[in-house]
Amino acid sequence: IDLNFNNACNLRCKYCFTNSPKGDHVKEYLDYKAIARLADEADELGYFEFDLQGGELLLQPNKLFKVLEAIKPERFYMYLTTNGYYLDDAMAKRLAEAKVSRVSVSIDSMDEKIHDEIRGRKDSWRRAMEGLKHVQKHGMDPYLNITVGHYNAHTDHLKQLLDYSKDQKYK
């Protein structure tokens, strides 16, 4: 099950339609009871994976943890996708305690300057890379989420990302 419950984001990625915390696309959220019913039905039907996506989920941690509580992650291989900007050690610990199994962190390049330029925010690369380490430290599966586009498809960046992921024993 893939659940996109938040379209707000703190970055301005050149390729992403979800590039603003303002606008009609961020006003409505599924209520927690609907999410709980969806998770219960998924569990009854034998689904074993649940993926939370956004926007940036860690931008609104209180909502994220209410959603996790509604889902009851212990029933699933629970994972979420983040740009990693707010994925500090304390957040990684909270996610692990909430029974999140895997955290996918979006990285566009092993070159910090290129990644930050694509993402539209200085320090986004450094914080994302640190976030991956925090995920691993707290026993969750770190995962590189790589978006491929014209800006990196014909460069060494993809190979560098894959080699790094393998060297770090990321999924």
Where are these regions (language model features)?
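Conserved alpha-helical substructure of the radical SAM core
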Residues: I1-R102
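Generic structural signal for individual residues within well-ordered alpha-helical segments
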Residues: A36, F65, K93, D116, ...
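Alpha-helix N-cap and loop-to-helix initiation/capping positions
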Residues: V26-L30, R119-S124, A153-D156
